Amino acid sequence: LVAVTVSVDDDGTAQSCHISGDFFIESVSDAESHALLHDLERALISDDSLRSVLDAHPSCQIIGTDEIAIKTAYSRAVSSNLPPLAGAPAQRVGVGSPDAPNIPASINTQTKQPDKSSEYRERWNALKPQLTVIHDHPRTPDEQMAIDETWAREVAAGTRQPTIRLWEWAGPAVVIGRFQSAQDEVNLDIAKQLGFDVVRRCTGGGAMFIEPGNTITYSLYAPLDFVQGVSIEESYRLCDWWLVEALRELGLDVRFAGLNDIASQYGKIGGAAQRRFPVGSGGAVLHHVTMAYDIDAAKMSRVLNTSREKMSDKAVK
């Protein structure tokens, strides 16, 4: 989903706006990503072409939304039926991308994908001799976010071996995506009351509801060569191939769903996020996954401002 918050003057004229959501942006730097969003926001206010803005940032790629969805969210916010009042809160409207609808996993996963198992196995076999697997000790949510980006940048710089890190959480958390709005995604007062830390990760995607012992989280820090020649969409399947195969060997009916989800016949059971860290001729890909197996859905619904659309494919009860 992409959301646009619009601030209007006394006459109802849009003065500024802010784009947020669970989309991803791949770029050479944080500055490039922020510049793209800033230029898109300016184009919305001035009614300029969003496609021209995207074309002017060839080093950036948006995944999970597009200019049509962004423009639609902005138009809905501006033309909201709520009368603009001086000093009233900015209006925020979210909309899903028409190119990436949130289809329930039971439907979406029926789409046949080419079988790339042999290619994925070859890539993993090539990576395996260099790969270190670490079952990490419990860390606070802030520490988890910091170490994830630090280790990814170290692999990118060649100072750390490719690594799989299995997380342990020291406390409950809500982890929001790189471009999400905390106040829009989380009931911050309730989260604080219940002892949840709200932290932002360095990758895009949606909010994760974490309670220690109820989730499995892992990160893969791999050289960028591991995903060389593979589209961003396909790289999610490559990075999670070993996990899906392992779950199937345990007798579980799991498959890939949408861009970045892992699903069973009951719905979504896990979600992934990914980001590339290009550095000269090297670089790294950070890919992390959280699978929830015992969610307290009632508590989650209190802590998160989760839309009905986003909940439509979640295997919770």
For each feature predicted by the language model, list its residue ranges.
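Active-site loop/lid in soluble adenylation, ligation, and acyl-transfer enzymes
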Residues: 1, 65, 75-94, 98-189, ...
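Structured beta-strand/loop patches that form or line metal/cofactor-binding pockets in enzymes
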Residues: 1-13, 262, 269-272, 276-279
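A generic structural motif
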Residues: 21-26, 222-228, 297
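Contiguous, small/hydrophobic- and glycine-enriched helical/loop subdomains that border
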Residues: 215-262
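Active-site- and interface-proximal helix/loop "cap" or "latch" segments in soluble metabolic
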Residues: 3-85
